[in-house]
Amino acid sequence: MIELENVCFAYEKEIALRYVDLHIEKGDSVVIQGPNGCGKSTLIKLLNGIIFPSEGKYFYQGHEINEKALKDSRFAKWFHQQMGYVFQNADTQLFCGSVEEEIAFGPVQMGLSEAEIKKRTEDCLHLFGLEKLRD
């Protein structure tokens, strides 16, 4: 169901994931734990299609997950309906003032630029047909 093959990811000069292999079958329970800075959040972002491997491959249900695949709106909608995660401090996410703020919450927590947050929020509003409900 989920497979990573020799996945690497780096933030500029800082290596976050180095040659990670992972195989998770449907029904498996998985815990990702480790000290600060070991790559847990990076791995979760990668599994959710927020970032992509600089090396290696990521497969979900036999489909390679990469930037090109997720540019296909039908595929992206299918994938994002299947995959998601809960933030470590989920209580702070509840009850944003608008649908737009709720969608932007994740990218804000990831520390993305204002322009990238706006782009991703607009993409999600469009993908799920929520433009009229943004406010």
Feature map (PLM): residue ranges:
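Short helical segment in ABC ATPase nucleotide-binding domains corresponding to the A-loop/adjacent helical element
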Residues: D91, G97-V108, K118, E122
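Conserved ABC transporter NBD signature motif
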Residues: G56-K68, F79
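Short coil-to-beta microelement around the adenine-binding A-loop and adjacent beta1/P-loop entry
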Residues: E14-I15, K77, K132
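Conserved ABC ATPase "signature" region
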Residues: A115-R134
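The feature captures the beta-strand-to-loop junction immediately N-terminal to the Walker
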Residues: Q33-P35
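Conserved hydrophobic segment flanking the Walker A/P-loop of ABC-type ATPase nucleotide-binding domains
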Residues: I24-K26, W78
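Helix-to-loop junction immediately C-terminal to a conserved catalytic motif
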Residues: N48
